[in-house]
């Protein structure tokens, strides 16, 4: 994947995460702050940071629950080297339903 394709895919993914949270978090429990390619989610469990790493073509997640993760895009999914999927992990930790195939 070239840099342009990665940037577009990563941006689409982060915007998708923001949209799903805003759609489902009707009580405003999660404070969403998107600045460029850095997304901060302030939750009852702590602050999540999601950002893109163009050089490695990865999305990085810092979770107050499960720690740091690096995700690469493969076969329609953002996966970590140890087998986690980004959308599945966010669903489990945030309680927001992310259809992992919806944006692809």
UniProtKB/Swiss-Prot annotation:
InterPro entries: CyaY, Frataxin/CyaY, Frataxin/CyaY_sf, Frataxin_CS
Classification via HAMAP family: CyaY
Name of this protein: Iron-sulfur cluster assembly protein CyaY
Organism: Rickettsia prowazekii (strain Madrid E)
Record keywords: Iron, Metal-binding
GO biological process entries: intracellular iron ion homeostasis; iron-sulfur cluster assembly
Keyword Repeat assigned: no
Gene3D superfamilies assigned to the protein according to its UniProt record, in alphabetical order: Frataxin/CyaY
Molecular function in Gene Ontology: 2 iron, 2 sulfur cluster binding; ferric iron binding; ferrous iron binding; ferroxidase activity; iron chaperone activity
Function: Involved in iron-sulfur (Fe-S) cluster assembly. May act as a regulator of Fe-S biogenesis.
Domain of life: Bacteria
PANTHER family: FRATAXIN, FRATAXIN, MITOCHONDRIAL
GO cellular component, one term: cytoplasm
Similarity comment text for this entry: Belongs to the frataxin family.
Pfam families: Frataxin_Cyay
């Amino acid at each position: 994947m070239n840099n342009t394709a990665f940037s577009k895919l990563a941006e689409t993914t982060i915007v998708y995460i923001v949209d799903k949270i805003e759609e489902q978090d009707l009580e405003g429990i999660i404070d969403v702050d998107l600045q460029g390619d850095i997304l901060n989610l302030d939750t009852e469990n702590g602050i999540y940071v999601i950002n893109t790493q163009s050089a490695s073509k990865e999305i990085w997640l810092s979770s107050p629950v499960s720690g740091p993760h690096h995700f690469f895009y493969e076969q329609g999914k953002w996966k970590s080297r140890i087998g986690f999927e980004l959308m599945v992990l966010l669903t489990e930790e945030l309680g927001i339903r992310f259809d992992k195939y919806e944006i692809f």
